[in-house]
Amino acid sequence: MKLNYGIIGTGMMGCEHIRNLKKIPDVKIVAIADPNERSRKWAEDTCEDAFKLRLYEDYKELLAQEDIDVVVIASPNFTHIEVMRELFKTDKHVLLEKPMCTNLSDGIEVLEKSKKHKGVVWIGLEYRFMSPIQSLINHVNEIGNIKMLSIREHRFPFLEKVDNWNRFNEKTGGTLVEKCCHFFDLMNLMMPSKPIKIYASGGQDVNHLDERYDGKVPDIIDNSFVLIDYEDGERAMLDLCMFAEAGKYEQEIVLTGDRGKLETHIPGNEVLLTNRQEYSHRTVEIKEDSRVKEVGFHHGASYIEHLELIDCIKKGNQPLVDCQKGFDSIVLGLAAQESIKTGESINLNDFLKNEYEI
């Protein structure tokens, strides 16, 4: 079964998908759509001679092509809702890049419509497929009952995007949605119960302060601490800094149970496993997934994501990363942004106005 792909949005992430799909058998990219001429040229250059592309400025023309089986939506965050509304008029499969949407009402709309859609709807939260994360999950039974999870990301500022759309909360959903939905998804993946309350403190203290776009000053935060309480008493914490480049590690993850602790770093090739009873620790080498043919920006996770999506489509299975998981990840980000704005902790059931349980 050969699958024909169309890519909507061919900036940095769209071209990342193209590089991955080039290495996967029985896949053909037949069309791309992007209103920006330079981005369309990037897609052509990335494809090289692997695919003969049809180029569109308007994504609606791409969605109208009957020979396209799977659509990858990698357009700017704020466009996701309008593109998905059009996609839901078709039966095509879709990989929708993170974040699923930039606000709660749009997220609920996509979630509800996805339940009736004939095609697979997959959300691009590929961090869960990184080898260090998979290694943590493989050893989680060795640390007993999980009590705490800490994720630290200290990295470089946001890169420049077309028309600088990623400088403003209204177009990104906010830093804790745009960037950190990945980490909230990992928390939801690893923690044994549901989140019930969130508190965040953060601000824009260093980055983009001297930038102006059409007279507007960027308002995206560049650092934050986020604390999450879970219904069975577990706790999770996110430590984010966007002006901390040049460190040895970009991400550090610590998962603590009542019998031990797991630690890993990204980039890195080891997991440290601590045993309280034996008062000992040992290092476990991370085994890279042998299926990976393209490492890309995310340590091979995007490649595995595509393999899993293709397998899901061919076998008629439910997606591993469905709209509910995508929705849950943005709920935490949006609630954290609200907590920073109000200075108060946010009860998640109240935040959702009793419409959904996460």
Where are these regions (language model features)?
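C-terminal helix-rich "cap/oligomerization" subdomain common to oxidoreductases
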Residues: I7, D26-V27, C47, V70-V72, ...
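Conserved SAM-binding strand-loop segment of SAM-dependent methyltransferases
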Residues: K52-D58
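Predominantly a Rossmann-like dinucleotide-binding segment in NAD(P)-dependent oxidoreductases
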Residues: Y127-V217, G343
